[in-house]
Amino acid sequence: MVVIGTVMSGLGKGIFSSSLAKLLKDKGLAVAPIKMEGYLNIDSGTLNPFRHGEVFVLEDGLETDMDLGTYERILEQNLSRRNFVTAGQIYGDILDRERRGDFLGRDVQMIPHVTGTVKMHLRQLAMTGGPDGGPADVVFVEVGGTAGDYENGFYIEALRELAFEEGPESTCFVALTYILEPATLGEQKSKAAQLGIKRLMECGVQPQVIACRATNPVTEKVMQKIGMFSNVPLNRIFSMHDRESIYFIPDAMREAGLDREILSLLQLHNRVNAGKEDQSRRKWSEFSSRLVAPRAHRVTIGVMGKYASLRDAYASIDKAVEHCGIWLNASVDLKWMDTSTLESKADVAAVLQGVDGIIVPGGFGQRGVEGKILCVEHARTTRLPFLGICLGFQMAVIEFARNVLGLADANSTEFDPKTAHAFISELPDQKKLEGIVGGTMRLGAQDVAIEPRSFAEHLYKSNLVRERFRHRYEVEPHYIDALTKAGLHFSGRHPKHPIMQVLELSASEHPCFVAAQFHPELTSRPTMPQPLFMGLIAAALIRKYPQAASDELIARWLNAPTATAAAR
């Protein structure tokens, strides 16, 4: 299944592809998505979040596009580096092979060598992208950009060749297009969509399915016109108009019969497991019913970030909070704030007026750091529910060192290499990587040993969890005892090394003050909300609605008064 955009980028190719993949997965088929990017970067790790949104870290440590997060959340399936390819990876692989002499003296060209490498990668994914490394029934290919872009032309050519080689019943192309609806005209116009699809057909690709993005449901008249000019029957044209939530898209596709059309096109009926489909639909149905149900409460959570002007920079945090609200029967409004504008305690108190809890997320560089520290101090001293993530974890340590231990110059060597009290310093294996930036951090899934009877254990219901990391700095080991004796409890650690990974204050000191060196937002799923976020939202609900403590759904996530005290 190949999904290619036309007219414009940003239409939701990942949402379409992952939603359709979910329907086939629900039927018992093994699906393997892949995103193919046209940029020359090896991965997304060094991209500016203002330009490209958040970096989504996979289990194996690859730093990828935020669309991989969409695939993982909708499919509820962990992906790996084989599910993400850039032009930089393709060219790098070819040049390495050329230097090794793998091409036997031939002149290396775009065709057949570059396109051949793309096809090889896709065939390998087809053979190993299923459960436990087995074959996949369907590979979903999302081509970044739009038809006609110079950067993705070799991908489209490779996919055209692959379709020819594998046969018409092995490949299905989807053109995702856009239907204009100018306010001055008051009607939908299909000309841009027609031209965009024509541009794709000029590349030698005949789409079998067309998905029409639009503000409102696409009229049958418009779909008939598009079908006539693109040789696609009406029953294979899908109106992908705006909906209240992206999680409604799979059900909309099912109602339109799109899954049945794909099974017919690719002759996959004999691989359907009806029993698994019923079970999967019941699970998603429960989630969908909660999604549309009226919420009993409403709270506001402040996101104290450095890239607050672009919500895509924190896309997974946005989704993790949404998941928690659904399962806690609460509407959660996010208030995005740029900490680089906060210069005093008064500034922080003013912007946090009416906020029921805060998240201090990750980031790099010194801009906005002092504002983050002020936010942590405000949360700690006013008992405002607090969740720190990555850099937010480190800022919680520095704030505690400055204001509880009394070391006013406590800092991180990232921001002040000459500080006399380096409470945060580089991980030992990072110090030898001077001048190398891309792909060198502590990346991917790592084990976290959770302290018994701690707040973290109460949330996770486990003494060993696996979370995803993306950092270069850690709590300086020789300060750990001083911090612990003063009341900052490290309840999550690396099982073998003195790397602190979760911190918290006792329930007697704070209802919810917890921070993680890892990125918990990356593992939140629609039907399995992330525990640390659940603890934060539950505490925010109790702060605003004390009577909600009698709600068992909320109370089970609260910081038990005996938990961290007993552990200490």
Where are these regions (language model features)?
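C-terminal and late-domain segments of enzyme folds
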Residues: 443-447, 451-568
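Cysteine-nucleophile active-site neighborhood
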Residues: 14, 18-22, 351-447, 452-455, ...
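Active-site proximal loops enriched in glycine and acidic residues that flank catalytic Cys/His/Asp
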Residues: 5, 35, 177, 214, ...
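Acidic/polar loop patches that form or flank catalytic/metal-binding clefts of enzymes
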Residues: 209, 235, 271-275, 387-388, ...
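Flexible phosphate-sensing "switch/lid" loops adjacent to ATP/NTP-binding sites
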Residues: 1-333, 340-357, 364-365, 372-378, ...
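A generic structural signal for well-ordered coil/turn residues at beta-strand boundaries
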Residues: 206, 233, 297, 354, ...
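Short beta-alpha connecting loops at secondary-structure transitions
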Residues: 51-60, 243-247, 360, 381-387, ...
